[in-house]
């Protein structure tokens, strides 16, 4: 009987949206089609099973922190990473950032080195907690938002890329200027999603020690502030607090 026509012209019920807790209303509205989509339900089921069998980073309450700390209406910079750190206590939902008290990873150490050369007076902190950037409108987004402990890229191809492409498209739809910072070949493939006439794309090699020669000297942070100021948007204060505690 499944091939019988629907006599009342009614479509099957769409899946109910799965909306993460404490998400800003503008993200909820922009991403509602994603939260309602079958792939997102499948991704949620996959993660539920993964957490039963493996240690998954970041912890569930932190997965959407990039969106929580930076509402869509406040985004003026997007820095795209690939997937979360896969070591203990590192990942907390912001690309390139680690929790207070955790050793600064090599890529972030190189980011600090470039900041020291690029931004007059910048002093590299002893921590790697980038929340103060997020709270200024810097969306620190990974393309994949979860990972198995010790297994880099283990959650690629499970649906996250579809979701984070939708995030990038939502930011691209903004009329006011956003600066997109794309480091490395993986991030640079997302350039095709950025079509807004007011936006600026800054791209270079990845800050990883494996490709640092294509990153050092590119001055992405001063270029970002110049682009923002030309559009009448305030610059980012890249200097991080000397001491931090996780809230």
UniProtKB/Swiss-Prot annotation:
UniProt keyword annotations, A-Z: Cytoplasm, DNA damage, DNA repair, Hydrolase
GO cellular component: cytoplasm
E.C. number: 3.2.2.27
Catalysed reaction, written as an equation: Hydrolyzes single-stranded DNA or mismatched double-stranded DNA and polynucleotides, releasing free uracil
InterPro entries documented for this protein: UDG_fam1, Ura-DNA_Glyclase_AS, Uracil-DNA_glycosylase-like, Uracil-DNA_glycosylase-like_sf
Top-level EC class: hydrolase
Role this protein plays: Excises uracil residues from the DNA which can arise as a result of misincorporation of dUMP residues by DNA polymerase or due to deamination of cytosine.
PANTHER family: URACIL-DNA GLYCOSYLASE
Stated family: Belongs to the uracil-DNA glycosylase (UDG) superfamily. UNG family.
Protein name in the entry: Uracil-DNA glycosylase
Taxon lineage: Bacteria, Thermotogati, Deinococcota, Deinococci, Deinococcales
